[in-house]
């Protein structure tokens, strides 16, 4: 099946732009936003703006290195080259584990969503179906993957735009509200804009940043981009404003139509908005959207882990068999391994006690922030490693240079502190540090084996 170990560049600027955009629009917006609103009130809008700025800093740092050295293993390779082999090893495996956990949640969610329409069909049938379908998609050419991901993301984005436009119609003209405009007074009528104080807004930041998780896939696409020097900068520069529009715009509409303390209490914010327009089948519309979102997420999950493991295998941080590719340039071994892992993980998800799964899911939050911190540290070390003339010649530099990166780093450390401060998420720090210790033990055994092979 395999012909060599090379990936093929088949992703266009259009594919990469929508992949980067779609990766940050998922359950964090469709469901997680309700919890963030409860925590911060209307000031959650400010939290999403602050989080968007931090996400942009992370993307620019990754983009600077990706344009200079496009690699499928992306931030794992950059960590290895700039911080050392151990940093690359831990970062790569932590990212893979993070995405696997997220993928477990996504495939399980797909079964639940389909159960809304077909309650008599067991969920495991839908879960098995979507895993096999996504596996087949990822075994095709990367161009097919990119095209499907483009349309998945397109449907998500189109639905959000329709909801924002419809919401503005309710706010300004009272469409669907008996001709009575709702206005925007709900943003300050129920306890003020900072209804839960500054602390409420600050505490919501950890949830906001998790909602932006997935943006780092833009770096992984660099290894298969046709023209990374053009496509990566265009994708990165276009995404932040769009994300801010979709998140901030959507929540602005929702909280203008409904008092913030009622959002999420009688159903999904998206369902409530459509129902307010007089659309009785709002639940089905939302269900189609979240189904598309979960398909997009699973598709990107398998793609991301496959490319990361392929790159790590080439670096010597993962088994060499993961470096094998098909004639189409697809890392088929990693795709099959991810598929098998998903099938086994879905089974575990059904038999696992709820609190245990919460612990594992919490690790994804820690792992996301960990990967972002390693990206920023790698960029700082990358800049220090280059002579001044090469720094000046960089084609996609971070605005403000290392100073901006350090500011982003301080912010992420603050997010980790928030995770530890909040009782519901504190356990993720314990589990996260335990994961790092396990990787360190694995690294020790790996180095010992490498020395033995070198002496043989």
UniProtKB/Swiss-Prot annotation:
InterPro entries: AA-permease/SLC12A_dom (IPR004841), Amino_acid_permease_CS (IPR004840). Keywords: Amino-acid transport, Cell inner membrane, Cell membrane, Membrane, Transmembrane, Transmembrane helix, Transport. Belongs to the amino acid-polyamine-organocation (APC) superfamily. Amino acid transporter (AAT) (TC 2.A.3.1) family. Residues 178-197, 264-277, 353-355, 421-424 are periplasmic. PROSITE patterns: AMINO_ACID_PERMEASE_1. The chain crosses the membrane at residues 18-38, 39-59, 96-116, 117-137, 157-177, 198-218, 243-263, 278-298, 332-352, 356-376, 400-420, 425-445. GO terms for cellular component: membrane; plasma membrane. This is Proline-specific permease ProY. It is a multi-pass membrane protein.
